[in-house]
Structures are given as structure tokens and as C-alpha cells.
UniProtKB/Swiss-Prot annotation:
One of its GO terms (cellular component) is periplasmic space. InterPro entries: 6-blade_b-propeller_TolB-like, PD40, Tol-Pal_TolB, TolB_N. Belongs to the TolB family. It is found in: Periplasm. This is Tol-Pal system protein TolB. It comes from Bordetella pertussis (strain Tohama I / ATCC BAA-589 / NCTC 13251).
Length: 438
């Protein structure tokens, strides 16, 4: 949780924060729909924009139009596509595509299809993707689903279009988690990657912190406070069952999953100052200490290969980001620009470090190429927090302040395209992007 490094010195914060946790009340578990009103604002374009036309799906006009709108919205949010008007195309899945005509309209690619309702009440969706330059079909697939599942089908089609055109796997079918504050209530919510279909996993009168996805997307680890102190729980989303996995003396915080989902790296104060430990994701009293430093070590994250951990430490004075092996050997410092770098995240391919950097008095999301050492500031807000990579590494999710309120924001990994998702009846905190699940 970023505020751990935002108030006075680190040691003072832990003392203050630890005392405050005693005041926290019990949380109520729930898995139910959340009624959040959303507005998405997008700015900027990618270095490359692919011209693509998305025709309304034929036969069932109402559902076909809605299906195409979701696909268009998914592709638009990336900033990598330029939508070509396909109104009145009259295409269905069996149509012969006039490639030259669509090329003349400026479309290098054309997506089209049909949606029909079967006798069992389910909808059959068939889609095609044409390459108008090469005058051939790039993709074609059929889906089946209930009316409630059609939005998911649209995301799956958008994923296929994105991958066929860019060569990179799409993330529109993935999920995100975040904490939503409404009045005096805090909710841990899970939603589609576009912020729609939010569900409440946990509700509390007191703050919920540090949500973290399991590698298979079935569980969330987080910190909750029913026992009067911070305890790390693992929560199974399908059943709402949960178990405590770090309930040791002192503060238990900052859970992060190992790549195989069997362990969690956590920050514990059981032996004094905050240090990094590894505990079992299945619970139990066993733990293994990783760091032994005279400073405060926190915010651990496994590298994608599972062989080392990156974390934040003030061992050099101000908070910086380090890497150490699981054997707890000497830690290697990774960040040197500026005197304040926290909240590290590593890209899915292990090539790029993401973190919050204080520059000129503002807290911004930065990325560091671990090979070249080149740093890029991705955002220009005054208080940008909690960065999280998309599972394909192409986008970054974070929390930003807009008009005095905390909102969900996104930026492309090169910093060119930005989007803001405003929840009109609450404030979003600590977003985290879920993994690919299929």
C-alpha cells in the first residue's frame, strides 16, 4: 500500500499505522452485483494505429449492434486502432466481402458476423475477420452463450481481433480488482477489464488494502482486520471461502503470489522492523524469512521466473527498489533516479519495472527498462498510485486523483495512450489487473 511511504519517515508510519489498525471493525463477506455508474475518457493514440471496420452483427439487430459496440469500445481504449465507419454495411457472416471497396474506405481489416437466438434460448454468434489488403480471411469462429454472456463473447471476439492484427494476446476478457470507497463503506470489487460488471467480494466499514490476484485468477489475497490487527487472507472468488495465511505477531501486509500459486511473499513485523517472508498460500504456521536488513523492507513481488523477489526498502536512506534471490542473499538496488521510488511491479516478460516515483513533488507512474536502465515517466498526475501491468504487458492500471477524487486510470506501456474510468458514486483505490485465465 503506497501510503506506507507517504507520511513522515517509514518507521514512524509503521508505528502510527499499526496503532490505527486496532480501531478497525469486522468485515462482512459478500459476492453480489455492485451498482457502479461508469464513465470512460480516452486520450492519445498509439505509435501505430490499425484501420479496422467493425460492422454491426446481422439478423438480431438489437443484440448485434450491442455486440459490435462492445468490440469497438475495447479496441478504441487501446489507442492502437482507428475505427472506420461500417454503418449500413448489410453484412452477415456468410457475405462475400468486397475487399477493394472496404480498402477504398480506409479499412485494412473488417470484422463482421451474425447473431441468432436458438430454440433453447441461447445465442449463437459467428464472426469473421477479413484482411482487405491481402484479400483473405484472418479469423473465423463461433460462440454460444446466454443473453447475460453476450458481453463476455464480445470481449472474446475483441481479444481475437487484437491478437490477429497485432500479434499480441488481448486482455479484454480478463478481470480487474480494486477497492471502492462509498461514504463510510469500503468494498473489494472484481470487474471486467473495462470496469463493467462489478461484483462485491468483500465489504467493510474500514479500509481494505493490498488486493493481489492468484496466477490462475480464482483467488484474491488481501489484508483485512477482523482480529484487531492486519491479517493476510486468501479468498476464493467462486465460493467466498477464505483462510488466514499470515496472522503472526505484529503487522501482516503486502501479499504477493508466487508464479505457481503455492506461496505468498508478505511483509511481517513479527521480529521488529518490517521484513520480507514467504508463507504458504494454503495457510499454516510455516514461514521463511527472506530479507534481514536494518531498514524497513516491504511491498514484495516475485519475478516471473519465481527465482527472486523485488521489494521496497529504506536501507539506503529514502525508499528505493531492490531485488534479492529466494535464498536471502545480498540485495541488488534497481532504482537510482530520484530519492523516492516505491510500489514495484514487474512486467510479465520480466523486462520492465513499474513503480511510483516522486519527481518534482509529484507522485507519478514510472517504468524502468531493466536492460538499459532507461526510465520513462508514464503519467503526469500529482498523486498517481498502485500501478499494475496488464497480463500482456501492453497497458498499466493505476489509481489517480481527478477533481479531488480517486479514480481508476490506465496508460499504455509507452505512455502514449491514457484512459480514465470514473465511478460516479465512489472512489477507487489500489487497482490490480488479473491474469489470463484461459
Amino acid at each position: 500500500m503506497t501510503p506506507a511511504f507517504r507520511r513522515a519517515d517509514l518507521t514512524g508510519f509503521l508505528r502510527t499505522y499499526g496503532a490505527a489498525l486496532i480501531l478497525l471493525l469486522a468485515a462482512m463477506l459478500a459476492w453480489q452485483p455492485a451498482q457502479a455508474q461508469l464513465r470512460v475518457d480516452i486520450s492519445g493514440t498509439g505509435a501505430t494505429q490499425y484501420p479496422v471496420a467493425i460492422a454491426d452483427f446481422a439478423v438480431d439487430d438489437t443484440h448485434g449492434r450491442a455486440l459490435a459496440e462492445v468490440i469497438r469500445a475495447d479496441l478504441t481504449r487501446t489507442g492502437q486502432f482507428r475505427l472506420i465507419n461500417a454503418a449500413g454495411s448489410g453484412l452477415n457472416v456468410d457475405s462475400q466481402v468486397a475487399h477493394d471497396d472496404w480498402r477504398a474506405k480506409g479499412a485494412d481489416f473488417l470484422a463482421y458476423g451474425s447473431i441468432t437466438r436458438g430454440p433453447d434460448g441461447r445465442y449463437d454468434v459467428r464472426y469473421r475477420l477479413a484482411d482487405t489488403v491481402k484479400k483473405g480471411q484472418l479469423d473465423g469462429v463461433a460462440f454460444s452463450g446466454t443473453e447475460q454472456e453476450l458481453r463476455r463473447v464480445a470481449h472474446q471476439i475483441a481479444d481475437r481481433i487484437y491478437e490477429k492484427i497485432t500479434g499480441v494476446r488481448g486482455v479484454f476478457s480478463t478481470r480487474i480488482a480494486y477497492v471502492l470507497k462509498r461514504g463510510s463503506t469500503y468494498e473489494l470489487q472484481v470487474a471486467d477489464a473495462d470496469g463493467q460488471n462489478p461484483q462485491v467480494a468483500l465489504r467493510s466499514r474500514e479500509p481494505i488494502i493490498s488486493p493481489s490476484w492468484s496466477p490462475d485468477g480464482s483467488r484474491l489475497a488481501y489484508v483485512s482486520f477482523e482480529s484487531g490487527k492486519p491479517v493476510v487472507y486468501v479468498h476464493t472468488l467462486a465460493t467466498s471461502a477464505r483462510i488466514p495465511v499470515a496472522n503472526f505477531k505484529g503487522n501482516n501486509s503486502a501479499p504477493a503470489w508466487s508464479p505457481d500459486g503455492s506461496q505468498l511473499a508478505v511483509a511481517l513485523t513479527r521480529d521488529g522492523l518490517s521484513q520480507i517472508y514467504i508463507v504458504s498460500a494454503g495457510g499454516g504456521s510455516n514461514m521463511r524469512r527472506i530479507t534481514r536488513s536494518p531498514g524497513i523492507d516491504t511491498e514484495p513481488n516475485f519475478t516471473p521466473d519465481g527465482r527472486s523477489i523485488i521489494f521496497t526498502s529504506d536501507r539506503s536512506g529514502g525508499p528505493q527498489i531492490y531485488q534479492t534471490g529466494l535464498d536471502g542473499g545480498d540485495a541488488r538496488r534497481l532504482t537510482f533516479n530520484g530519492g523516492y521510488n516505491i510500489s514495484p511491479r514487474i512486467s510479465p516478460d520480466g523486462s520492465t519495472l513499474l513503480y511510483v516515483a516522486r519527481r518534482d513533488g509529484a507522485f507519478r507512474i514510472a517504468s524502468l527498462n531493466l536492460s538499459s536502465g532507461s526510465e520513462t515517466l508514464l503519467t503526469d498526475g500529482r498523486d498517481d498510485q498502485s500501478p499494475s501491468f496488464a497480463p500482456n504487458g501492453m497497458q498499466v492500471l493505476y489509481a489517480a486523483i481527478q477533481n479531488g477524487r480517486s479514480v481508476l486510470a490506465g496508460v499504455s506501456s509507452d505512455g502514449r495512450v491514457r484512459q480514465t474510468l470514473s465511478v460516479l458514486n465512489g472512489e477507487i483505490r489500489e487497482p490490480t489487473w488479473g491474469p489470463f485465465t484461459r
